[in-house]
């Protein structure tokens, strides 16, 4: 029986069972990658301070809820990191430390995001990256499991556009005549997706 959740010395989540044993959490309950498309879904994107959810932080989350092809709600917020972001992240995203000063912290943001997305199918570009950050932060901050199924648009693009020079979101958007101006801001990336 599950008793508590903790973080080990390497920053990885674990659970403690009733007999005192520690079990590593390997994103148990994480949703599946699917192909079927329901009428209601949420497109999401995050911006982070780096690539590894064990050491890097979320600095922006945007999610757009659709029903029958119409946007019926948007969740978008900057997230205050525990340390200032570096110049490279600012140059990539356009997000500055000044912009993050008054942003909510990750714990508050995770609960609001969880409430917004509910049980919707999640859609995004390279969304497995986003899901891993969100899964770990929901578990660490709120002891919640993100079990939503998801569709990764990048995986689809790789299958249907094998001849592209790469499968970055901007390259695929350009292929379809979509201007990726403002890319690497979460809300814009959601709209491109």
Predicted regions and their residues:
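Conserved non-catalytic scaffold segment of RNase H-like nuclease domains
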Residues: 5, 10-148, 162-184
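A short, structured active-site edge motif that brings together acidic residues
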Residues: 147-157
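Acidic, divalent-metal-coordinating active-site segment for phosphoryl/phosphodiester hydrolysis
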Residues: 185-193
């Amino acid at each position: 029986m599950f008793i508590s959740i903790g973080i080990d010395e390497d920053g990885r989540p674990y659970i403690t069972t009733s007999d005192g044993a520690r079990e590593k959490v390997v994103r148990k309950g994480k949703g599946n990658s699917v192909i079927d498309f329901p009428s209601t879904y949420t497109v999401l994107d995050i911006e982070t301070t780096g690539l590894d959810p064990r050491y890097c932080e979320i600095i922006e989350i945007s999610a757009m809820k659709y029903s029958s092809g119409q946007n019926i709600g948007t969740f978008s917020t900057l997230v205050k990191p525990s340390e200032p972001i570096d110049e490279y992240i600012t140059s990539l995203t356009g997000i500055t430390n000044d912009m993050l000063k008054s942003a909510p912290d990750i714990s508050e943001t995770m609960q609001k995001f969880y409430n917004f997305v509910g049980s919707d199918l999640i859609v995004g570009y390279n969304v497995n990256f986003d899901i891993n950050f969100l899964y770990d932060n929901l578990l660490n901050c709120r002891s919640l499991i993100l079990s939503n199924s998801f569709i990764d648009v990048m995986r689809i693009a790789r299958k249907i556009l094998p001849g592209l020079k790469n499968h970055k979101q901007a390259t695929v958007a350009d292929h379809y005549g979509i201007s990726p101006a403002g890319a690497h801001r979460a809300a814009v990336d959601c709209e491109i997706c």
